[in-house]
Every structure is written in structure tokens, then in C-alpha cells.
UniProtKB/Swiss-Prot annotation:
InterPro entries referenced in this protein's UniProt entry, alphabetically: KH_dom, KH_dom-like_a/b, KH_dom_type_2, KH_sf_prok-type, Ribosomal_S3_C_sf, Ribosomal_uS3_bac-typ, Ribosomal_uS3_C, Ribosomal_uS3_CS
Pfam family, one: Ribosomal_S3_C
The name this protein goes by in its record: Small ribosomal subunit protein uS3
Subunit structure: Part of the 30S ribosomal subunit. Forms a tight complex with proteins S10 and S14.
Native species: Pseudoalteromonas atlantica (strain T6c / ATCC BAA-1087)
Length: 232
């Protein structure tokens, strides 16, 4: 059976950036890595209703800078910035250094893999038919401008006795092309029948030199015929 490599892992350093950008010596590396995990775990739990896309962590000179990418920045900030201040204090306590929190808004949540996967998972938990949830996500992504999208759900679909996987795809999702900008994400739906896994691949276009390519113009065909004779 053919196995698939993680679409983000294989593109790191080619067309995908790391979500933790810092350098540490051997003694501090493990502590920093575990610390990043704790910060992400806390923020994901605290901002469960804020439509989190990703959390980027930087560590400039004995401090920590956390950028929260979310579709609902108002929920993160809170009334007069009270909520974000609570988050900053807790992150600073976890990291043991001064913390700074930045918030980046996700303009098109329909094209964000993590937000699409979480949306499908929440629909499944609300007992929406899985085929309807998948089709709606695919149609919305294609309408907003995705070049292709694939959605897969697996588990006891519809309360069936035997677990299975079903997928739906529109457009093209070239997993073998390194320059393809593919946003891959997973999520889980906790239903009464057990956990249903959700996987989403969104193809947004091709990246060259770190920037998405615009639509290539077709080459103009050369005109046939004799070249004009020179006089003289």
C-alpha cells in the first residue's frame, strides 16, 4: 500500500516556514521545545472558540513573542484588551521570560486547512451528515479561490458498526510537487459513537522563490512565413 508523507513536513524550508523560529544551544533546546508545546497547548485550550489557525513562536533575546493567527481576533483580544493581557501573563509565567502577544487575522477562513478541518469536526459533533459537511467545505473553498481541495473523514461514520474512511475532492491536489502550496491540517470530532478523524488538503497555487505564482500567460505562437528581405 502506498503511504503518504506529511505534506507540511516535507515542504519545510522549501515552500513552508517553521511555526517555531528560534535558535538554542544543546543545553536549552529540549526545554525550549517542551515550553513551546506547553504554550501551544494552553492557548489552544483557552481559545477554543476563537477559530485558531496556527500559533507562531519566536524567542528574541531572553523573551518570547507569540503570534496568534485567528479568524476571530475580537474573541482573543476581549473587552478593552483584557483577555489578551491575561494570556500574556500566563504565557510569560509558562515561559519564565517576558512575553509579547501579537494577533494576526485570517482573512479567508475557507482557505485555511486548520479552520476548515475544525469546522467539519464541529459540524459532525452537532450531528450534521458527514457528506453534507464535506461537500459544503469543498464548495466554499473552491468558490473563494482554491485550486483544489481534498477532505477525508474516517471512523464510525453515521454510527456504523464498522469504521471506514470516505473522501471527497475537487480540483487538483499535487502532493508530489514540492513547489505546490498545500495547506494540510487534521482535527477530531468527539461523537457518541467514538472519535471521527478529519483530514484536509487545500491546494492554493504554486510557490516559486517564496512567493505564490500568478497565472502563467500562454506563450504566443511564432508567426510562420518568410522574414522580410533587407534592402541594399
Amino acid at each position: 500500500m502506498g503511504q503518504k508523507v506529511h505534506p507540511t513536513g516535507i515542504r519545510l524550508g522549501i515552500s513552508k516556514p517553521w511555526t517555531s523560529t528560534w535558535y538554542a544551544n544543546t543545553a536549552d533546546y529540549a526545554d525550549n521545545l517542551f515550553n513551546d508545546h506547553q504554550v501551544r497547548q494552553y492557548l489552544t485550550k483557552a481559545l477554543k472558540t476563537a477559530s485558531l489557525s496556527k500559533i507562531v513562536i519566536e524567542r528574541p533575546a531572553k523573551s518570547i513573542r507569540v503570534t496568534i493567527h485567528t479568524a476571530r481576533p475580537g474573541v482573543v483580544i476581549g473587552k478593552k484588551g483584557e483577555d489578551v493581557e491575561k494570556l500574556r501573563k500566563h504565557v510569560s509565567k509558562l515561559a519564565g521570560v517576558p512575553a509579547q502577544i501579537n494577533i494576526a487575522e485570517v482573512r479567508k477562513p475557507e482557505l485555511d486547512g486548520q479552520l476548515v478541518a475544525d469546522s467539519i469536526a464541529s459540524q459532525l459533533e452537532r450531528r450534521v451528515m458527514f457528506r453534507r459537511a464535506m461537500k459544503r467545505a469543498v464548495q466554499n473553498a473552491m468558490r473563494i479561490g482554491a485550486k483544489g481541495i481534498k477532505v477525508q473523514v474516517s471512523g464510525r461514520l453515521g454510527g456504523a458498526e464498522i469504521a471506514r474512511a470516505e473522501w471527497y475532492r475537487e480540483g487538483r491536489v499535487p502532493l508530489h510537487t514540492f513547489r505546490a502550496d498545500i495547506d494540510y491540517a487534521t482535527s477530531e470530532a468527539n461523537t457518541t459513537y467514538g472519535i471521527i478523524g478529519v483530514k484536509v488538503w487545500i491546494f492554493k497555487g504554486e510557490v516559486l522563490g517564496g512567493l505564490p505564482l500568478t497565472q502563467e500567460q500562454p506563450a504566443q505562437p511564432k508567426k510562420k512565413g518568410r522574414s522580410p528581405k533587407r534592402e541594399g
